[in-house]
Amino acid sequence: MPKVTLYNTAGAAAGEIELNDSVFGVEYNEAVIHQAVVRQMANERLGTHATKTRGLVRGGGRKPWKQKGTGRARVGSIRSPLWVGGGTVFGPTPRSHAKDMTRKARQLAVKSALSEKLRANELIVVDAINFDAPKTKEVVKFLAAFNVDGKALIVDGGTASENTVLSARNIPGVKAYAPSGLNIYDIVHYTKLFLTC
């Protein structure tokens, strides 16, 4: 079982903690992580893109001129794709971009990403984050204690997690939520990951 230093909110070491080997000791699997990230991003797409074909554009039911005898090219509708104001050929239609992935593979991706964060020293375990009130400056002070100036993800399982979420949401590049919201995209996207025990 991997041992990591346990910190307090001031950035000082407060002891050691053993992490579960089945979660934080998993071999790095880039392919599964990539598949999970692509799946999550694809599932967030609305897929409402649409264009009108010649059958959907309003008008064009009447033949503009007779077939023969005018000297002009034959035409059956003013909504032909060749005409200005006509329909679109092979344009996008509404569809689902959803991708599927087995539960075990999704879990493996999260475990693999968390294990890699630990190996890269980008995972910081904090004993508790207790903000009395939602104050942005408290999170700024907390991040400064760990010399974090880039992207940071705070996963707070404590009782005051709502205060943490509200305090962090006004800082660019910083996100905070309860453990139930943890997802593969955020683990990969944010440089530093803070976990409370």
Sequence positions of predicted segments:
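Acidic/His- and Gly-rich active-site-bordering loop/insert found
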Residues: 41-51, 58-59
